[in-house]
């Protein structure tokens, strides 16, 4: 199918109408192919799509499926500029350690499960650093997997800017599973 094992198709109009751009690998700027994006079909894999070129701006994680209008992927508007395949770890294992302070200081909580509310589950108001031990995770700025999203691969994140955030305002997180 592709270099990534997946394929994503972007359509200018709702319900998979209008000009189409197919992608099977990371693309830093597809604005020259489409002036707007109102529907998406993910035919394989999980993809991160970004509001602006060079993998910047609001990010949306899209598993395989059909998105007939931008509201279905929680898009703010019909503007997208780049995409990349999300590389999932083999075996489906997932483990993350979250810390109440930067540089892995303060109280640490480890989990292998999704967390809809860090306040309810860990009695934390914010996450200042974390270690992704296994798997790929998404941080959300609001409880119940809402708000701005941040994609975290297996590595250490000493401060919020390391995962692309301006502040530690993370309120929920979940694993990406196949």
Curated annotation (Swiss-Prot):
PROSITE patterns: CRYSTALLIN_BETA_GAMMA (PS50915). GO terms for molecular function: structural constituent of eye lens. Residues 2-5 are annotated as: N-terminal arm. Keywords: Acetylation, Eye lens protein, Repeat. Gene3D superfamilies: Crystallins (2.60.20.10). The keyword Repeat applies. The keyword Acetylation applies. Residues 88-93 are annotated as: Connecting peptide. Disulfide bonds: none annotated. Residues 6-44, 45-87, 94-134, 135-177 form the Beta/gamma crystallin 'Greek key' domain. InterPro entries: Beta/Gamma-Crystallin, Beta/gamma_crystallin, G_crystallin-like. The modification N-acetylserine is found at residue 2. SUPFAM superfamilies: gamma-Crystallin-like. GO terms for biological process: lens development in camera-type eye; morphogenesis of an epithelium. Monomer. Has a two-domain beta-structure, folded into four very similar Greek key motifs. Crystallins are the dominant structural components of the vertebrate eye lens. Belongs to the beta/gamma-crystallin family. This is Gamma-crystallin S. The gene is Crygs.
